[in-house]
Swiss-Prot record:
It catalyses: Hydrolysis of protein and peptide substrates preferentially on carboxyl side of hydrophobic residues. Inhibited by several hydroxamate compounds, the most potent inhibitor is actinonin. Residues 66-712 are extracellular. Residues 434-593 form the MATH domain. This is Meprin A subunit alpha. It is a single-pass type I membrane protein. Residues 66-260 form the Peptidase M12A domain. It is found in: Membrane.
Amino acid sequence: MAWIRSTCILFFTLLFAHIAAVPIKYLPEENVHDADFGEQKDISEINLAAGLDLFQGDILLQKSRNGLRDPNTRWTFPIPYILADNLGLNAKGAILYAFEMFRLKSCVDFKPYEGESSYIIFQQFDGCWSEVGDQHVGQNISIGQGCAYKAIIEHEILHALGFYHEQSRTDRDDYVNIWWDQILSGYQHNFDTYDDSLITDLNTPYDYESLMHYQPFSFNKNASVPTITAKIPEFNSIIGQRLDFSAIDLERLNRMYNCTTTHTLLDHCTFEKANICGMIQGTRDDTDWAHQDSAQAGEVDHTLLGQCTGAGYFMQFSTSSGSAEEAALLESRILYPKRKQQCLQFFYKMTGSPSDRLVVWVRRDDSTGNVRKLVKVQTFQGDDDHNWKIAHVVLKEEQKFRYLFQGTKGDPQNSTGGIYLDDITLTETPCPTGVWTVRNFSQVLENTSKGDKLQSPRFYNSEGYGFGVTLYPNSRESSGYLRLAFHVCSGENDAILEWPVENRQVIITILDQEPDVRNRMSSSMVFTTSKSHTSPAINDTVIWDRPSRVGTYHTDCNCFRSIDLGWSGFISHQMLKRRSFLKNDDLIIFVDFEDITHLSQTEVPTKGKRLSPQGLILQGQEQQVSEEGSGKAMLEEALPVSLSQGQPSRQKRSVENTGPLEDHNWPQYFRDPCDPNPCQNDGICVNVKGMASCRCISGHAFFYTGERCQAVQVHGSVLGMVIGGTAGVIFLTFSIIAILSQRPRK
């Protein structure tokens, strides 16, 4: 009966091999924190909850209102500012982060207050609001509870710079529909338009993507029905974006202040022009870099990724011929820094021998005025990954300099490619501390269920703290969204570091890979670690304590990770696919973790006058007052008793030409997305702002996952019991057969 024994051994070998290969997914019921303790809200929601009824929702006006057209309301740069100490530490850090966006993308600059008569003081009042233009006194911007997000702060600063909301333009009704009967009673004034005596479009088109545009559900009665929709339905998911400035926002800002230069962008090159951005070839090297286009088979640039015929250029250094150690130099023009630190970002790929090298150098002033002193900064080695990669190199130049790329051949006989460069950006900003690239993200998104997660590598900040991010491609809490969360990791420096680690600001960014950094609309979130971040899962201990004490051990990093703290609705899948977030199907995540304890006390005494919120105009009762000779109607405000006083409702006539109530005018928001129920397997459909979100059922043995509850999975413990029980029965059966087969025949 040797064949029976062999069969048994083979069967169980295959059985246990199969069990080891089957991925048993388990969704841990851990305590999940949300950085803002709930869903991120927009300005109108925050101000409504605070009981505020302001002009256009978030603007305070003086009695003698000056409009955007008045040149006397223009600021002189840099704008003096004060961060009041009633602001939270996280809000202060977020404001400074927003300042950097203005400096990088526009001519706007800020400086600490030093006794000037005109300045902005950022304070925490109720809600998010600002005044419009320079009032020539100290004036307020409120960053209240829930307002400490980069895009919201940028929005309020744009008001202070002189901008009203996009949908207040005179020609608004040509581009969007206002559904007056869906607006909260008494808040219709927020949707008024204003004539050219108050607002100018600066000769730019209507901008659906403007940071100053209302969101579809602003001031709505019904949570699932919008108040404003685009006449081109494709823009309904775009209006009210809260990522960053749009290209037209920046164009208007530059036109208003008659400037085009930025403060922290030193150099930028996509190699689309024949002059290769003023870069020069080395004269003492062995060969040159070649300016190539994407027309050749298999050669695709990073800027356009081969999407445009006859366009898409890059620099290439071939390493497939010649001799080992032959090199080529590519040098930038001479650059003049204003700060003491720069970040050189570029995309590169190496398709030749693993021994090929790409070296970044700087050429400095030799103290005689000649830029000739060479210093090696960083080396990149060839490998088996032939994809485009992002790189960051920290430079610390205080005088004029050039940066150089040196390509060196490693083993030409075993090379079939070379070294490629594209999309170079040099800024006077810090480089991101942690950079994580998730490749083939569309496939990752398709193959993961709600709650499945990916862990980043461990990064270290300048203090020596280990940290990382957790990516949930399909957020368990918010259907159709991606979740990102932060954690600290145990590391080699833990014994000498301070625990719990508090007052460190976390900035997580999903990179919009638009080649021009000024036009990037990356998605960023911030929070600051605090002793108030505790968890019942660890006996209400601070989650930022030493990870080896309060964290969980993970074999992939051979380290302990703390509980995650993050955002369940970091960015929607729809938005991810809209811009260049997934260029080359790569999701690129930046994460920073820096000490901002020094911002604890920032308020300074002031001189002269400062506006008080109680002395300003809110949206009051309105009277139609005809302007002589214009036939236009303007609003007359009345001063309320207090800042939070509500206003009486009024009847508002509908705008003309909004169109009949037909299907082509009413987007999907107006149809109940849960009728019919799109959820499978008895899933419950919930209408979340006009979008269907499925709540999948879960039993003792099985649970359903997927965006429509279409996938069934078995709880890991039950599956183990089933497999173990089945294996036991089979083993017992074969054992009985083997015993019976060995009994002597009569």
